[in-house]
Amino acid sequence: MITAPIRTTARDTQIFDLISKEAHRQEEGIELIASENFTSKQVMEAMGSVLTNKYAEGLPGKRYYGGCQVVDQVEQIAIDRLKKLFGAEWANVQPHSGAQANAAIMIACLNPGDSILGFDLSHGGHLSHGSPVNMSGKYFKAHFYGVEKESGLINMDIVEATALKVKPKMIICGASAYSRDWDYARFRKIADSVGAILLADISHPAGLIAKGLLNDPIPHCHIVSTTTHKTLRGPRGGVIMMGKDFENPFGLKTPKGETRMMSNVLDMGVFPGTQGGPLEHVIAAKAVAFQEALSTDYLQYAKQIQKNAQIMAEAFLKKGYDIISGGTDNHLMLIDLRSKNLTGKEAENALIRADITINKNMVPFDDKSPFVTSGMRVGTAAITSRGMVGDDMIRIVEMIDTVLMNQTKDSVIETVRKDVNNWMAQYPLYI
C-alpha cells in the first residue's frame, strides 16, 4: 500500500546500478551490431515521459478512452513527420516492433494457410518473413527465395520462377543480413503477375532509403514496414506505410457495404488485430526521431554510414576475409569466416573480450547451426553516430583481425581492449 507520494519512493538501486553498468558498456566499447544504434538524448527523454501513463486504444480522434486530446496531437505529429520523411500517403506509427508490424500486415491481408514468399532466413532473411518458429511460418504456408552460391546475390529470374510456381498471396522483400540494394520495381512486376500483395520490410536500410541513398520501395510496393531504430536512430518500435492508399483487393466491406480502403484494413490489423493500447511515450520518441531524420545533418550522417561500411568492407577484403556478395551497398556486411577456420560463435566471444560487439550470423549454405554459425554480421550505424569516419573503419578492422587471429592469447586481447576503451573515450556518447 502506498502511504506517501510516489516521488518519495526509495530508489531501486539494483536496477539503476545495472542501467549505469550498461551505459558504461556502451560508452567504452565499439558497437558493430548492425541492428543497433544510439538514440539522441531527446528521443530518450520522450520515452521516459509522462506519456507512458496514458492509455489510448484507437486512432487520433477515434479513441476508446477519454483524456486523449494531448496524445492525439503527439501521434498525429508522428504520422505526419513519417509521411513527409518517406513521401508516403498513409502511415500507422503504433506497432510495438518491426515483427509486430509484419504480423499486423499479415493478419490484415492473409488467411491461415495462405502462401507467402520471403527471403530465406539462412540466407539473410528475417524470422517474421516465414520462419517456421515464427507466427508467419506457423499460420501461413511459407516459401523462400535466396542468393546464388557463387555471387551471393538474389537472382530475380529465380524469384520470378518461384513465384509463378507457388502463387503466393504475399511476396516479402527485405532482410536482416543482405548487404545489397533491392530491385523493388522488378519485385512489383513479379507480384502483379501472380496477384500478390508486395510487402517491403526496410527495417535495416530505412534511414538510407529516406535520404535517397538506396532504391525507394514506396512507389513500387503495396505496403512498407520498418523498425524505427537501426539506421533511423529512433526508439525501438515499428511503423507501416503505403505510398498510395487503395481499395482492398480481398472483397472486405464496411457495414454500409462499401469497399474498405487498405489503410482501414491495415489499421485494424494493428488494433484490434494484434495489439491493444499503443505506447504513446514511444510514439513521441518516434516523432522526435523522424524530425531529426528530416534534417540536412541527418543526410550527412546517412551518407557517412554508407561510406564507412564500404571502407570497412574493403579493409576486410584486404585482410583476406570473405564478404558475402563481395561488398556492401548499405550499412552492413555479412562475413564468411570459414576461410579463417573460425565460427561465428568463436568470433563473437573473442571480440566481446576486447569490448568489440558484433553478432554471429548464418551465411548462405551454412553447415553450422544458428547457435554456432559460420559468419558474423557487422554494421556501421552505431559507430557513425559516435562521429567515426573512414580511417577509423580501417583501424577497427585491424583490431578485429588482431583479436580473431589471437583468440587464445589473453594478453593480446587485453591490450586491444584497453586500446578500444581509451579510443572510445574520445567519442563520448552523451555529453
Curated annotation (Swiss-Prot):
Stated name of the protein: Serine hydroxymethyltransferase
Subunit structure: Homodimer.
Species assigned in the record: Cytophaga hutchinsonii (strain ATCC 33406 / DSM 1761 / CIP 103989 / NBRC 15051 / NCIMB 9469 / D465)
HAMAP family (UniProt xref): SHMT
Metabolic or biological pathway, per its Swiss-Prot or TrEMBL entry: One-carbon metabolism; tetrahydrofolate interconversion; Amino-acid biosynthesis; glycine biosynthesis; glycine from L-serine: step 1/1
Function, in words: Catalyzes the reversible interconversion of serine and glycine with tetrahydrofolate (THF) serving as the one-carbon carrier. This reaction serves as the major source of one-carbon groups required for the biosynthesis of purines, thymidylate, methionine, and other important biomolecules. Also exhibits THF-independent aldolase activity toward beta-hydroxyamino acids, producing glycine and aldehydes, via a retro-aldol mechanism.
Compartments, record wording: Cytoplasm
Gene field: glyA
Keyword rRNA-binding: no
Single Gene Ontology BP annotation: glycine biosynthetic process from serine
Site (Plays an important role in substrate specificity): H229
Top-tier EC class: transferase
